[in-house]
Regions:
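Gly/Lys-enriched N-terminal cap/neck module of very large, oligomeric protein machines
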Residues: 3-142, 152-158
């Protein structure tokens, strides 16, 4: 579970430290308030390629840091050990990325890692789904089962 997200010099965000509690978290706000910046930061911390154009105007680097509390670190530890890193001693993992105009660096528990390894770890930390895809699936599923046998023409279309 993500417990802390820190963002510095990313797009319109000068500095943000967001401690997340347990339970459902909803991010809402006006257009341009920074919701997409937060989602983008989370994607980058999980291994997505960084766009240098997102570095805050007038700055050379942006930094994103996250803390995840793990219920079971065995799967993450296996990936870390496979990548030549020490296993997590406790059930917490700290990921940090520094995106610069000349170079990007990423760290897991203060050890430098490749983007490939970061992505492998990131895939195990977060399950993401998009509202639009989920809605499309639900709509398609309901339409298929509700209207499939109503008419001969629609039955052929399914």
């Amino acid at each position: 579970m993500l417990t802390l997200l820190k963002i510095r010099n990313l797009a319109l965000v000068d500095e943000l430290a967001w401690e997340l509690g347990s339970g459902l978290i909803s991010v809402t706000g006006e257009t341009g308030a920074g919701k997409s910046v937060i989602v983008g930061a989370l994607k980058m911390i999980l291994g997505e390629r960084a766009d240098k154009g997102l570095i805050r105007t007038g700055e050379d680097t942006c930094t994103i840091e996250s803390v995840f509390d793990l219920k079971d670190a065995s799967e993450i530890n296996a990936i870390l050990e496979e990548g030549g890193l020490e296993a997590c001693e406790d059930t917490q993992i700290i990921i940090r990325r520094s995106i610069g105009t000349t170079a990007n660096r990423q760290f897991i528990n203060d050890s430098p890692v490749t983007l490939t390894l970061l992505k492998k770890v990131g895939e195990r930390l977060v399950d993401s789904c998009r509202y639009s895809r989920y809605t499309r699936y639900i709509c398609t599923h309901q339409c298929t089962h509700t209207y499939k046998h109503k008419t001969k023409t629609s039955a052929g279309a399914w």
